[in-house]
Amino acid sequence: MLSLLYILYKYIIVFNHFKNELTLVEMLAEGEESGLPELEAAIENRNYASYNFSVTGPVTSPITDEEHKANVRKGIAHCMRGDVFQIVLSRRFIQPYAGDDFKVYRALRSINPSPYLFYFDFGGYRIFGSSPETHCKIESNHAYIDPIAGTTRRSGDIVKDRELAEALLADPKENAEHVMLVDLARNDLSRNCHDVRVLFYKEPQYYSHVIHLVSRVSGELNEDADKIKTFIDTFPAGTLSGAPKVRAMQLISEIEPHNRGAYGGCIG
């Protein structure tokens, strides 16, 4: 799996589920004949194969529960020594399967709807997921990071949800983590921006299954700033690395036994 993949698509099919509309976008070179009629014919053709999905074995992990707990203890020791304030350790799980994994994505869309849903088929591998988080967004001359830290389940009751959100706002651990991530975002944007400010702070946002605390940090790009470099300098997300970010990533590379691959990356 590549670490970075940039694709310039000739055709884009845009679904607007709110308006129940479908828009076709085509990138044409000067003098090139349009291929939209063939694309429209393919869309209208309902003669397509359907494949089932089934798991073919148990869920496994490259490391045992005890090994993962030992890794967490190493992370805690580094925090206690003052090497980092926060470190986010992860563990890989593997599920063998047969059939069409797009069915899993469709199920994910139904049971965990989020602002960002994605499915990419690169031939030899697929990446799909569901996320509420905007890592970095650049519009005109402004860059935005939306740190998310602080999560609790939803109850299904409006009054109870409000109480859960208030408890989340009062939780010292969740607040400490959130403040740290806001500071990281301010620092990351300051490398290429000026007038860096917090637009809103620790705002409870309600999703299908959980309540998150979300802030928004913005900055105006410096006159000589490059937008791509601005994004690169914010990567990876502090929510999946730690603080100070560089030292946390160094320790993660030492502690975790495998590369994270697409996990913790960005889709856009």
Residue ranges and their predicted role:
Residues M1-G268:
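Extended alpha-helical targeting/anchoring segments
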